[in-house]
């Protein structure tokens, strides 16, 4: 039985005629922005930067979050520290950021703690001493067993600072999952971490990233030299230095092994090719993490979004594409083709559309170019229900109580017989996991309501912001995966007027 501290207060829904409405109110009033009034929040086509590294505000609500609690913790899972394990160049940072993005999407208050960030901060403060970064690269700092006593003390200081911040996150920020991103390559150190967090009533889950595919490893090492450590380095010098880091750790590194120390762990081989699990309780949240790891891939490609033509039709209408629609999709095709180096649409591009006739016909030009085209019913636009075609004034007159609720929470609210953005987010989750599994560029041709949901995932948006973002029909939105964050670019479509 849940306590008052675990579960939000509930009340009966008061939206008459909404046959798909749930029977309880699952959101604390404090978790919804009081200022989220459409009259005071003009929609904008200004897209924010990736928010994955930003600390979550207390009132943050995630797009696929099922409910809110006073404690901030979900699924009765308690506090968990995910401790990454792996040699340099094994994609730990990539994996930890991707996992953080997915967990936040689910509404789990998750923060990233990169040991490299703490090292860079501390060494920047000591540029005039023998502890500057150039000095670190010429001695034993990056070894698991440094011989220099100053280096040992510095590493201990940096780790203590990180651990203190993790504890603060749990105790003062309603945190639920902390992801500790570091090599953590010694069995003895991992046991100390387990015992320490256990004393604080924090569960540990160790995730080791192992790459034994030579081609994948080399690709990941090349990507690793783009880290902040090598911001102004020559690429060849950076590659040599990073390779030396790997060698400095290989001699001492100890894989997770149930015989050596029976820890709760997951070993991921080649980013989801094979998963080994040891001593885990298969609760809901752990199962979601395992399932995500089976789908996660090292990503360096792009996701493109284009509005479909004639997307202002009534929800139930499904006419064929018009001549104007054909002109529009040709311009989309040409603009996208011109953005590639060889000015051609790559055959590896995967195109997703809904199952509506006009979107199927719109994708034909890409199919003719050799692209893989997939039609997904989940990509059908938001169903406006009884609110379809009504002005704000008409909505206020006909559904006054519902209209007031919509103004205060446009993300979760449904009009009678309608869908909410939250419904779309839950419906699209399987496609998000499928998207995570792909290694090729993807073009999604969809209604603006669908694009908002995908954007919210890829840029770690707050749910309250999603209904307010506009994606003009004369732009293709390009979001590119990078190790540390996703980057957005707008490709303007010539010959299409801005709405």
Regions found by a protein language model. Give the residues of each.
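Acidic, low-complexity terminal tails and accessory targeting/binding regions
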Residues: 3-15, 53-73, 257-258, 274-302, ...
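Conserved substrate/cofactor phosphate-moiety recognition/catalytic segment
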Residues: 93-167, 384
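Active-site-proximal alpha-helix that buttresses catalytic centers in soluble enzyme cores
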Residues: 52, 299-371, 398, 419-421, ...
